[in-house]
Structures are given as structure tokens and as C-alpha cells.
Amino acid sequence: MRPEEFEIYITCVPGLEDELLNEIQELGCKNTKLTSGGVEIVGGWHDVWRTNYYLRGATKVLVRFASFRVVHLSQLDKRSHKLDWEKLLKFRKPFKVETVCRKSKIYHSKAASQRISKAISDKLDAKEDPNSMILVKARIASDLCTISLDSSGEGLHKRGYKTATGKAPIRETLAALFLRKMKFNGSQVVYDPMCGSGTIVIEAAEIALGLPAGRQRNFAFMELPSFKKNEYKELTKVEPKKNKLKFYGSDRDTGAILNSIKNAKKANVETICRFETSSISGTTPPTQEPGIVLVNPPYGKRVGNRKNLFALYRTLGQTLSEKFVDWQVGIITSDPGLAKATGLKFLDISNTVDNGGIKVQLYKTKINHPQI
């Protein structure tokens, strides 16, 4: 590790770390290490900027700042005061501290946060503010304290374009990783027949155009002394790719379609996105060329009564089986019983992953011929 380099920990939805690793390696990051809940890399501030700006599947980018053993609060106080906080944070810039304690002699997370906060305040003449974008995270596990800086600010699923959401939204980061699971690379048509606010369709369109995920938002690292605006501008210059494909969504709810159109316009992908009002039974392939259907139907835990959803899933399965021959199909659901109700023969079922507090899986198949 060179003097200007440090450890960077990039988190994602647990269960999809392998897809995040692939994306990070495609970005050209080196010294990658797969871990539970994310990927570790070694790099400098340019890598922090790039990973925040370009990665579609990442949840947060954390900068590892210090690591040391502690067994009591006075020791934590002493070690925290010795750290070079001025290299990480600005003088008199408000900040906040969060601490998690696991299997350690120090077990009071609030008291630990207070010690670290005082060290920063004493060094930088800065005040702690719960509303600050600058978050210092401490993890004390088995008496090892690791201090990191959240360089992202708001979660990276917040792309900066969405003004309207539906009843059961899927996070943009999860949509991007599931698109990768479907082997989408920007050269296939994508259709979501229950598109809600258009997340899956818009993610697919952005990928096809090569648009960076974070191009419409700000990040916490912009408030650090290490940030160089001109260097960042050079690092994030990108020309959109030319793409002749269109990406499609439909929904029976006219309000959802209007939201999708608004969101696509704000994301600047409205020219290659098409949305229309349609029931599942009335759904037809948007193109003659087969592509990918990726759909996040309602599940009983979030929208509606589970019993009423069986008919919906049955209709979805029949429609896909009869009309979407040669299409790749991915269905996201929390309920194996509802997946079974489609009548489709699934070739692969993903790990269980979290979607807004609900455990879901991706059920994949290819419609080679009518299956029902």
C-alpha cells in the first residue's frame, strides 16, 4: 500500500456481493477483496470519488481511517485524540459520530461515540450536529476499534432524479444488481410489466447509455479537505453512448405511469423509455426481438392481501408463458408460494436479499415454449 493509499470498504445489499465485485473490477479498481456485505479495495481519494460516482450496485463507500485495540473508554479517548483528524475533516465543519459495539469490553455505544466526538471537537474546533452530512462511523468488535468515514452521505440508491415513488418501490441499487443477475449489459430490450415508478426501466436505460449513477447528486466527500473540484470534474467526464434500443414499462395504475414518465424525464432518459397503462392480462411483448422481462410484483407483506395475489401471479405466469417465448424472465418476490403460483419452471433462484426490510429472491427462467 502506497502512502497516499488506504482501505476503502464498499457496501451493498448482502447476498449480492459477487455482482458488486464484478462491477468494481469492471471500473478498474485493484486489490479487491470480497467480504460479507461488501467489497474491500485499496486506493486513494480518486478511487473514493469514482466508486461513489459510477457504481450502480453500491450502497455506501466507507474510507477506513484508523484501527486500534481498546478495552476501556479512557483508552478510546486517548487513542482518538492522537489521530490526525485534520487530514480527514475540515476545521469547524459540523460532523456526527455513530458507534456499534460487538463482543467487546466497551459495550456502551453512546459513551464510545462521545469520546470520539470530543477528540474531533478538540482537534478541529468543530461541533457535532445530528443533521450533518459528515458521518464518522466506529465499529468496536472483539476489542478492535475501526474508524471509518462515510464518503457517500445519503445512500447511493438515491440517484438524484426521483420525484415520485409507487406503493412498493424497489431500490435503484437492488434493481441494478438484479439486472446484472439477468446478464443485462445494455444491448438487450428490458420490459417491466408492473413498473411502478419506473425504477427498473430507468436503470436499464441509464446502463445502456453509459450514464454514471451519481451524476445528478452530491456526496459527503465534497465537504472534505481532500476534495479537489477540478480533478473531480476531469475524473467524471463521460460522453453518453449511442443506443438504438428502447426500454419499456407498463402498469395498470395510470398514476404510476405518469410518475414513471416524470422520473425518466428527470433522469434524462425519456427519449429511450416508453411507458403505457396496461393490465397484466393485456400485456404483449413491446418488441419482436426477445429481451429481458424483470418485474417486481406486489407481495402480501407490503401491498394487499396475500390470498388476493395468487390470481395476479397466476395471470402473470400465463401471460409470460403464452406471449413471451424466448424471453429471459426474472420475478422478484418474497413469497415462494406466489412464485410457484405463476406456474413457470424456474431455472435459478437467487440468494435471499433485503428490499426495504423485506427478504426477497430473484426467480429466473427462460420461456422456451409455452410452459403452462
Where are these regions (language model features)?
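C-terminal catalytic and target-recognition region of SAM-dependent MTase-like enzymes
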Residues: 279-282, 286-372
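SAM-dependent Rossmann-like transferase core, predominantly class I methyltransferases
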Residues: 147-183
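C-terminal edge-of-domain segments
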Residues: 136-152, 363
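Short beta-strand/turn micro-motifs composed of small residues
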Residues: 12, 251, 333
